[in-house]
């Protein structure tokens, strides 16, 4: 459903942001 797509997109965005943050810290 639409809600699952929104949650999936948010999860991917959060994952990318977390990876980017980790890369900046290293």
Swiss-Prot record:
Covalent S-S links between cysteines: none
An example Gene Ontology biological process: defense response to bacterium
Keywords attached to this entry: Amidation, Amphibian defense peptide, Antibiotic, Antimicrobial, Secreted
A single cellular component GO annotation: extracellular region
Subcellular location: Secreted
Source organism (scientific name): Phyllomedusa bicolor (Two-colored leaf frog)
InterPro entries, A to Z: Dermaseptin_dom (IPR022731)
One Pfam family, short name: DD_K
Entry annotated with the keyword Secreted: yes
Tissue note: Expressed by the skin glands.
Name by which UniProt lists this protein: Dermaseptin-B5
Higher taxonomy: Eukaryota, Metazoa, Chordata, Craniata, Vertebrata
Origin: domain of life: Eukaryota
Family: Belongs to the frog skin active peptide (FSAP) family. Dermaseptin subfamily.
Function of the protein: Possesses a potent antimicrobial activity against Gram-positive and Gram-negative bacteria. Probably acts by disturbing membrane functions with its amphipathic structure.
Modified residues (Valine amide): 26
């Amino acid at each position: 459903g639409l809600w699952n797509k929104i949650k999936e997109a948010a999860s991917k965005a959060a994952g990318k942001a977390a990876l980017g943050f980790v890369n900046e810290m290293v």
